[in-house]
Amino acid sequence: MNLYEYLSQGIKHFTLIDPDKSVDYLRIARYALEAGTDGILVGGSLGITASQMEKVVKDIKSVANVPVVLFPGSLSQLTDAADGVLFLSVLNSLDPYFIIGAQVHGAVLIAKHYPRLEVISTAYVIVGDGGAAGFVSMSKPIPYTRPDIATAYALAAGYIGFKALYLEAGSGAPQPVPPDMVRAVRKAFPRVLIVGGGIRSSEVARSIAREGPNVIVTGTLAEESPEKLGEIVRAIKQR
């Protein structure tokens, strides 16, 4: 089973580890694995070199029995030590660089230097507050109250041919992507749907899980509260 097939089947929880913010990333990975996470995303910040990323991924894979997937915040965050990469295009960025510019350069790097990486083309759509991701990518986030706009982006992503769509409220967002927005996007986008940002309780995770996403992502909970992370993972699976 390849990575895309794995993501497509059922509903899963992934833990996002940002090695630039989490020095003790192995401890966080172990907490997440003990909590029952189904996969680990690595990346996010801008201050990670290619050699650092390779070491982090190899270290995590040495203790993980789940897929380790790149979530690159820059072109330097590529390594074929990972199981795959979310090849992100920030659809609601106001800067063409984040829609297609970085992707052109990244595609050449992957083809030449990391051909073993499984590439998952991913429409990245920033919602609500947007957090650091929205600020850095110069995005115009979709308001929480406008599922119709999110649906329009989802339809466009499907027609263009993206394999996955990631609804991102942003790290540390005051609230997550609303369940009604997830529901609307699920109806419009038949492929892999990922939702992340602002999910801090099992109740919120369950309400989102019931709307049919394939993957729900949480970040710092593994470090801040391993017990709460376990509750969230169970809520997602038992929805």
Swiss-Prot record:
Location, primary (coarse class): cytoplasm
Record-level GO BP terms: glycerophospholipid biosynthetic process
Residues annotated for sn-glycerol 1-phosphate binding in this entry: Y166, L167, E168, A169, G170, S171, G172, G197, G198, G219, T220
Keywords assigned by UniProt, alphabetized: Cytoplasm, Lipid biosynthesis, Lipid metabolism, Magnesium, Metal-binding, Phospholipid biosynthesis, Phospholipid metabolism, Transferase
Cofactor (UniProt): Mg(2+)
Enzyme category, top tier: transferase
One Gene Ontology term, aspect cellular component: cytoplasm
UniProt entry tagged with the keyword Nucleotide-binding: no
Enzymatic reactions: sn-glycerol 1-phosphate + (2E,6E,10E)-geranylgeranyl diphosphate = sn-3-O-(geranylgeranyl)glycerol 1-phosphate + diphosphate
GO-annotated molecular function: magnesium ion binding; phosphoglycerol geranylgeranyltransferase activity
Subcellular location: Cytoplasm
Positions of Mg(2+) binding: D18, S45
Source taxon at top rank: Archaea
Xref: Pfam families: PcrB
NCBIfam families tied to this protein: GGGP, GGGP-family, PRK04169.1-2
Biological role stated in the UniProt entry: Prenyltransferase that catalyzes the transfer of the geranylgeranyl moiety of geranylgeranyl diphosphate (GGPP) to the C3 hydroxyl of sn-glycerol-1-phosphate (G1P). This reaction is the first ether-bond-formation step in the biosynthesis of archaeal membrane lipids.
Family, as annotated: Belongs to the GGGP/HepGP synthase family. Group II subfamily.
Name the record gives this protein: Geranylgeranylglyceryl phosphate synthase
Organism: Pyrobaculum arsenaticum (strain DSM 13514 / JCM 11321 / PZ6)
